[in-house]
Amino acid sequence: MSDENLLTTLDTYLASGIHIGTQQKTEDMRRFIYRVRADGLYVLDVRKTDERLRLAAKFLSNYEPEDIMAVTRRVYSVGPLKEFGKVTGINTVAGRFVPGTLTNPSARKFAEPEVLFLSDPRVDKQALKEAIEIGIPVIGMCDTEHLTAHIDFIIPTNNKGRKSVSLMYYLIAREYMKNRGLIGEEAPFSYDQFLEKAMNVKVKMNPSNRQRGRFHRRRR
């Protein structure tokens, strides 16, 4: 496999471990699996991950940043997600997703995004449940063991590793900004910038700071 037409170099993809899955697989994710290693780990197809990343960023670029909600409960994803929100202006929820955020107009931080972006459909199940209830599209980073019946657009990736999630958020941020004409070929931020946030394991998830920004109401 060559680097031609990839969003980053193949070496960068492999070094980040985005292709390293788990020892479980589902029928939903079979089409994204390249092979199984001798130790039983399923390996994702890097080229398919790259393709889906590109398409996800293109889809998201149809939305204003305030109309997108990006969510994660995974500790190592919190820092990269916050950096993602910082560089794109996209609203983020890092840590516990308060029930009713999308469904209860009386909730203190009630929001009406037009699209939801999840780091892990299983861990972020409350956000997914509410997105299904209100009928907005869901993009999800999915590993080999995930069920994807309620995910409208799958990004197959290792969504647990620090390097892999940092690279995912960096590339989607970069492509989102490029597609919207906000940056040129050279992004004013880097993968290392996102990775540095992931390496900070002392991330504080203060309930008062978990959700940032304000949301426009969904267009009727």
UniProtKB/Swiss-Prot annotation:
Keywords: Ribonucleoprotein, Ribosomal protein. One of its GO terms (cellular component) is small ribosomal subunit. It comes from the Archaea. One of its GO terms (biological process) is translation. GO terms for molecular function: structural constituent of ribosome. Belongs to the universal ribosomal protein uS2 family. This is Small ribosomal subunit protein uS2. It comes from Methanococcus maripaludis (strain DSM 14266 / JCM 13030 / NBRC 101832 / S2 / LL). The lineage of its organism: Archaea, Methanobacteriati, Methanobacteriota, Methanomada group, Methanococci. The gene is rps2.
